[in-house]
Amino acid sequence: MELRKIFDTIPEQFDRFRPRYSPELFQYLIDHAGIAPGKTVLEIGPGTGQATDPILETGCDYHAIELGEHLYAKMKEKYGAFTNFHIVNDDFITHDFALQRFDMIYSAATIQWIPEQVAFAKTFELLKPGGILAMMLTRSDYKTPNEDLYAKIQKLYDQYYKPEIPYAQGGFRYDHAPEYGYVDFQQHHFPGRREMNPDEYVSYCGTHCDHIVIPEPYKTAFFEGLRKVVAENGGKVVFEDTHVLYLTRKPDDR
């Protein structure tokens, strides 16, 4: 199975433990793009809605495309009652959007799974003139707030982290958007903070695609070790987050 499809195997855990983005980020995005009733928005790969509520609640005409059938079903369960909610279960790379065009397209950490040329060229085509492409991700630092605990956690990684499918993402260059015709590229940072108890931390780690594919006997020993080391070292893990928002725009005359 492709790593980008692994998340679909844990829809309930993914919904409960994947982090959300800062309210300040969404307010900036909504104001910047003028998202309101009458605007048409596409979210690429919403998962189970980690970045959906603030946009959907503007009253815009919200559309989403989700690759995972179980994640798609969870989205339908959570948001199906909204009259402005529309979602399809398909692969953005191959999906035919026909004549649909959008005022904004956004993606929360999903666009990195799409080849850069496809991601930028296809979103550019799907945007109306002047339309906004927004891309967001979270960078988390749990070393600085928990240095001793961090060192002990790394020993568990050294011993048990042996995923069957290596994680090879990270090469997507958000700042390459202008090479595909986009203009006004911007980057904005919004701080955040999370605290997790041992069980929450283990459940959160269990939503990482490369952690899901750790085989036994390593997997159980790894997660039990994480739970034990956190419980014995203060009982919590602190994350200092930086929510990153990349913005760019299709020219008005294209």
Model-inferred region functions:
Residues 113-123:
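A short, conserved alpha-helix within the catalytic core of class I
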Residues 95-105:
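A short acidic, Gly/Pro-enriched loop at the edge of an enzyme's catalytic core
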